[in-house]
């Protein structure tokens, strides 16, 4: 395949790009509307050079976010550190809805997570427009988001102060009756986009907390949790041997996280670090090291390039968290964001401990249209090529097809996957309907150059219905079985001849949960109670190809969920899911449908009084 070096040149140019021009100045960022306005002093008043010494400031009153006209914003530095918002936060569906209602034009849907201050800047840019609109839904969302982000927005531009706080404390109780599916690389999953958390029939639980801190341009984040799950019994020797043969992973062993075999998952009682990183902000670049969320693509159900379906990896990351303006380029392509990640993968046996790096670029030519490119490479591993600067740069800059001797030797550029996504607010119904698509190709420059060899996840989002402003609907289709002869036996998407467990981390696909050679879809019908509360019905369907899993597989999930606040700082998130699945080959030819029911309740406490400033 042929990869050009254009992304490399563009990345170098971006490092010298100027940030987007704001109303207050080139490098100053505004606080959200509703924050107290900065006051001016005249000579001779207390606190000036010609007056009396400044007395100790009185405690600032709480910021009130109401539906009143925004006051002049306070100036904030664009170089202050800020932590990422976790991908499972309630804020992301509300941000998407606010965009689809016709606001926050500066958001980049295809590149997540966002930092807390970047979301605050999006809100500030649309504050006046939201106020002047007749959309009560937009005002409710704006108020809820602004209140959540208020603690980050009280640091004056000339004070490199910081603060620490317990962001959340949470516990989730999950009961599963009936045999669930937990084989993301083959047959499918009962629970998706859950950071690869363990689950099995019986009682499962997680209890955790998250803390964050900032000091000037520096920030840190930690999220850890205790996890409990019963024993999960895997496949018989005959089934596991057949699947291992198709994967070309030999010999068959009990330790193979991508293939549940026997008592693969013993009862789990462990503490897991979900996220932990230190970061520094330089010219709107968040440079971090550690474990953080990653998502490429505008979809809700999954991201072809990256998602939170698997446990996060430890990585070094450079993320342009604010849109950049590049001279000449941005005249045609608009503001740009980019993200670079390099880290190690776990749970591989062929080969053990490979590395991965990804590069993503997103462009916004207009306020209604966004498109982006992303590339992921998996390389190295024990028994294969060494992980050196030579092998890294070989994959990063390689522009040629790979020969077989090169592929099995020390100069293998790695398993290369490229993605393309876009989103578009549809003309004439821009405040109603958003159309988007995500795609990924294996061994091609981009999915655009080879659409018949590309996996797809298209979708539409209707932000509200005529006469029912609180009701929204979203639907997505997904396929990793493109119409090409190469898509056979599960040996195309998310698989590679050398890196045979390529797109997995600890057994879970870190791209789209649909996995290899499957087709399906999802739909969400949501009734919004407020800016951070809703009731939702979800349907999910999956079918795996018969040439991949003998006799094929079928899954149908029906889920009812609700998110409700008890007061302002306690969130209750509950859901009930009924699943009906068929996988005759996995059950030694049994064609009867299997059923399982999952019931979960999660309580999350956001302790506002835990903030400590310094």
Name each model-derived stretch.
Residues 361, 564, 593-614:
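Outer-membrane beta-barrel "beta-signal"
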Residues 220, 236-335:
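Well-ordered mid-protein domain cores that form the structural environment of catalytic cofactors
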Residues 210-252, 366-368:
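Carboxylate/His-rich catalytic cores and anion/metal-binding grooves
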Residues 109, 195-200, 262-266, 304-307, ...:
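Outer-membrane beta-barrel domain signature
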Residues 294-295, 313-504, 516-523, 528, ...:
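Signature for the C-terminal beta-barrel architecture of outer-membrane proteins
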Residues 81-84, 107-110, 131-140, 213-218, ...:
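Short loop/turn motifs that connect adjacent beta-strands in outer-membrane beta-barrel proteins
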Residues 8-18:
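Bacterial N-terminal signal peptides
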Residues 21-202, 210-216:
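N-terminal periplasmic/intermembrane-space "pro-region" immediately following the signal or transit peptide
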